[in-house]
Amino acid sequence: MGVEHDKLGFRPCFLIQFFYHTSNDEARPLHTNLRRARLFSDLLNHIVANDSKSTRADDRLDNMCNMLLLKMDSDTNGKMAQDPKEPLDFQVCPTPVETAKRINTNFERYMAKYPFLFEDTSTKTIKFDDETIHAIVYWLQGINLKSAAPETLSTAFQVFRSANVKQGEGQYFTPQRIIESAVKLMEIDYHDKVIDPACGTGGFLFETYSTLLKRASGEQRDEIRTWAHRNLYGVDLDSINVKLARALMIGARDGSTNIVLGDSLREQKWQDFPMLTPVLGCETDGSYDVVLTNPPFGERLKIRATDAKQAKYSICQHTSGGYPNDKYSDTELGLVFMERAYRLLAGGGRLGIVLPETYFFSSSYQWFRKWVSRHFDVLAVMNIPMEAFQGFCRAKTNFYVMRKKSTKGAASMKLPSWAQPGKTWITYAPTIGINKDGKTLYRVTKEGTRTREVDDTVLSDVTALLERSNSSTSCFVATPESLVNSYLGVPQYYDRISVKEFERYVQTHLQGFTARTLGDLEDAGIISIRNGHGSPSADLRNGDIPYVKVSDLRAGMVNFNPTNMVSLSVAERFWRGSDSGLSPWSIVTPSRASKNIGEPSMLLPGQERAVFTKETLIMNATAEALFDNFYLGWALDLDVVRKQWGRVVFMQTNREDLGNRYREILIPIPDTREHGESVSNHYRQYYRSIAQSRAKFLKARESQNR
């Protein structure tokens, strides 16, 4: 019989080859989120299937973290060893028993050296069985964890934590590429006192310290370490996060113990965390120059109204409909961290925070934007492409840099060197060096050849800003007095490249045509635009009237799905009468929850008796227009028109949303009806021929089915 292997490729432990690893052998870093996630997912599966000691998810996470601490410590010691050929501590021995003994001996020494990392110091061994310890060491020994320590620890935590009840806690750890650009943008220096009140595994703190250390000369490096001891703080509610973050800073030779366990928001619980008050207590309010954080976010992650009232969080005084209110309401944690940051910051202090984009445009969060306008000036908005967090969530986020407004006459800290008074810097750069699979994204040539250059246009924009050079994907815009009716927090809205391309096209290709927005045409009565009828629930779909969803609008056609049909009575309820109100040749496009928003589909004769989901727009030319629906469809189908939709389609949490921003789309308008018909004639002929063929097909089908 052949030797059996599990998914990780582990062979029976007595067959594992034994050899010494040195620091010279540490040459295999885990450079991508995907590789890290796969490694730890496979390790978790192996532990669940084979380990006899650790049966609880929390125990597995804790013990795996302890193994990672030992590995990282071994890597650090190896890099500092005088003899690069000196064997590393973290490697397999000839047998599982010997490997486990060695690891547990090293763990006991590690606990004695860093006792403040551990809440419970009574257990001085790794609670995996010998074979599991042997297998973990075997798989990790040849990998350089320290080269990507922040993301490695974050990924391990994410994978192991997702296996238990904490899966929905909204802890989406920040990828290193976001952290790097964010820390650069914050321009933190040794004058600043910094805190991350939701520090996770310490990515922002580690990058801040590392950045200052890299800029320091030999003599200054000791001063930077002293600065970190006195000015770099972190808080997290999860004890394992705190342990990992502290260990990360120790690995950077910071030695800082300023990362503490505690609840940053619920003040009534602060007495339960003895080390928290010196970091977050009332006497620390107004003492920090920088708050830098990626707080947990999610619609279900809220602080209760009673807790908000006790802490007097004014940001929690709002209605569920999106308006300010005197009463306190349950509020998402990520938003409440805004007020915690405001309290911690001195006048003119800087806040750098990752937040979902939906807070900055949805009508449900008007109260939030009004609160921000009263308390902060928005200095910068840094686009975070969807791919960055796609491995764990699909919410669209951005990194926001804000400055706490000072009271009149009070002293205030100076602006960052790149900031312009009264203006906000926005980058809508489309890439951040991470693809949709979590792998490193490389630039590809026009010929389709992948280069070795990382495609991180966000970092390029930040670098250009700091170097005072130009960028085609960023700009300064005037900061509005209020964010309530502004899209300042949505970077892509300020990408007007598609608008400029359209204007050039009209000038060079459509002589005599003018450019007008859909909103302007609608207001003038030249076109009509309405939403679809509504969305019948699944249990009502049992009739013979087609119900058209956004997924049924494809390739310019309205397609009827035979599995989505409703009865006539249901249809009339959604039509609000006996007629659908639709007419042949109407133009239909998705308006929500579709990647094809803006793509025109034409309603053919005979398709009028249908119920369209409310997530569609239905457009028609009126008698006032110098064009018909065929021209309207042709105009909407132009590439230079379709590209404009990407600017106005926002992400409502994790779904595409158009709102009324369709009104900003520009289309060409002919000077005469004849001119319009001449350019769109091929469009007219195409759809008329399809309609004729469809009518013949349906007639033949009907006769054969009698």
Predicted regions and their residues:
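Flexible, glycine-/basic-rich loop-and-beta segments that form/coincide
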Residues: 5-28, 391-514
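Non-catalytic DNA-recognition/assembly elements of restriction-modification systems
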Residues: 461-537, 671-706
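A short glycine-rich beta-alpha junction/loop motif
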Residues: 400, 609-617, 649-675
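Conserved Class I SAM-dependent methyltransferase catalytic core
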Residues: 323-388, 394-402
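Conserved S-adenosyl-L-methionine
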Residues: 171-293, 298-299, 309, 355-358, ...
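A short beta-sheet element
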Residues: 578-579, 588-636
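Long recognition/docking surfaces used for binding and targeting
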Residues: 67-162
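Sequence-specific dsDNA recognition surfaces
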Residues: 519-536, 553-584
